[in-house]
Amino acid sequence: MFHRIEEALEDLKQGKVVIVCDDENRENEGDFIALAEYITPETINFMITHGRGLVCVPITEGYAERLQLEPMVSHNTDSHHTAFTVSIDHVSTTTGISAHERATTIQQLLNPASKGADFNRPGHIFPLIAKEGGVLRRAGHTEAAVDLAQLCGAEPAGVICEIINEDGAMARVPDLLQCAKQFDIKMITIEDLIAYRRHHETLVTREVEITLPTDFGTFQAIGYSNSLDTKEHIALVKGDISTGEPVLVRVHSECLTGDVFGSCRCDCGPQLHAALAQIEREGKGVLLYMRQEGRGIGLLNKLRAYKLQEEGFDTVEANEKLGFPADLRDYGIGAQILKDLGLQHLRLLTNNPRKIAGLQGYDLTVTERVPLQMPAKEENKTYLQTKVNKLGHLLNL
């Protein structure tokens, strides 16, 4: 149904337009996107004729600063925090509204010799400032356009236009597919662009390594940062893991209440201790401790989910009532840390098939699933049963 990111990049490099769709839980829309560096009046005319939306120009913060493009409003109340600057026309244009003059404004916006004084305000081109980090920070069309331009080796700026049906309603995926077929346009998703970047870019940095004696044995503790957020992760390494043989690995998501306070609501603490003990017995392995509290929703939201569970919701329903997916974790950063440690083949300590699929999606091979089941307690029987029934965990209860 959708094309590969590589196919879209090839078309963009040729000056063609692509369609980019975002998540159905976000704006749930598709935009025409082209590279600003290759924009022509013909492309602008195509967008306004068949897209019918607002023509905008996603740019980096650097462009906005150089051209003194101030935010359109001082207090942004847009639900998606779209970062409009003041609209502009190049001083050489007349009304600025024609396809030719809009293309001229965009071309001059990219001209390194242009200054802020070269543009009238307001105008008919609407620059948007992309967040640094692109779609890995904000999954919007603004960031997608700049990311695609950078992946093409072009100036980091794009031209976008929302696609609206002839009846005035927003075009959804079936409409967008028909549009792509009619005009022979490649169609991709922001979700796939995120996956592409995570797969092809190094996002983790090894910061520090120490010897860590524990109650379970002595490990090498290696601390990692990443370029996506402020979260810091740690790998506890035992023995020589560089032999090329499958290595026993536990990817453990942080659970303050279970790991530190011994909460009986979950089985996280016992799993953590059992994994360390098993790695110590084998004399070789890795425990990767990921700062993904509450399956990725954070500590306070996890406590809010617990409150809902006290009212009768299960762990999945509680997450969803708070507006989160059942499991918000992403395994891309963890996979990059494991690769940095030199691992390729894993014997994975887990009861969660999705964790296996998540790691294998980043070119790691799970040669064996090693069960890590803890005895159920009265306080967590319902929780564990929900993990089996709704999250597909492999447990014998």
UniProtKB/Swiss-Prot annotation:
Give any single GO term for biological process: riboflavin biosynthetic process
State where Zn(2+) binds. 255, 266, 268
Q: Write down the position(s) of the site called Essential for DHBP synthase activity.
A: 124, 162
Residues involved in Mg(2+) 2 binding? 27, 141
Active-site residue list: 327, 329
What InterPro entries does this protein map onto? DHBP_synth_RibB-like_a/b_dom, DHBP_synthase_RibB, GTP_cyclohydro_II, RibA, RibA-like_sf, Riboflavin_synth_RibBA
User: For this protein, what reaction is catalysed?
Assistant: D-ribulose 5-phosphate = (2S)-2-hydroxy-3-oxobutyl phosphate + formate + H(+); GTP + 4 H2O = 2,5-diamino-6-hydroxy-4-(5-phosphoribosylamino)-pyrimidine + formate + 2 phosphate + 3 H(+)
Q: How is the cofactor bound?
A: Binds 2 divalent metal cations per subunit. Magnesium or manganese. Binds 1 zinc ion per subunit.
Instruction: Could you list this entry's UniProt keywords, alphabetically sorted.
Output: GTP-binding, Hydrolase, Lyase, Magnesium, Manganese, Metal-binding, Multifunctional enzyme, Nucleotide-binding, Riboflavin biosynthesis, Zinc
Name the Enzyme Commission number(s) assigned to this protein.
4.1.99.12, 3.5.4.25
Q: Does the keyword Metal-binding apply?
A: yes
Task: Please give the Gene3D superfamilies that the UniProt record associates with this protein.
Answer: DHBP synthase (3.90.870.10), GTP cyclohydrolase II (3.40.50.10990)
Q: Where D-ribulose 5-phosphate is bound, by residue?
A: 26-27, 31, 138-142, 162
Recorded GO molecular functions are: 3,4-dihydroxy-2-butanone-4-phosphate synthase activity; GTP binding; GTP cyclohydrolase II activity; magnesium ion binding; manganese ion binding; zinc ion binding
SUPFAM superfamilies named among the record's database cross-references: RibA-like, YrdC/RibB
Q: Where does GTP bind?
A: 250-254, 271, 293-295, 315, 350, 355
One GO cellular component this record assigns the protein to is: cytosol
Annotated region GTP cyclohydrolase II: the residues are 200-397
For activity, the cofactor(s) needed are: Mg(2+); Mn(2+); Zn(2+)
Q: Which HAMAP family match?
A: RibA, RibB, RibBA
Question: Per the similarity annotation, which family is this?
Answer: In the N-terminal section; belongs to the DHBP synthase family.
Say what the protein does. Catalyzes the conversion of D-ribulose 5-phosphate to formate and 3,4-dihydroxy-2-butanone 4-phosphate.
The protein's name: Riboflavin biosynthesis protein RibBA
Q: Which organism is it from?
A: Bacillus cereus (strain ZK / E33L)
Name of encoding gene: ribBA
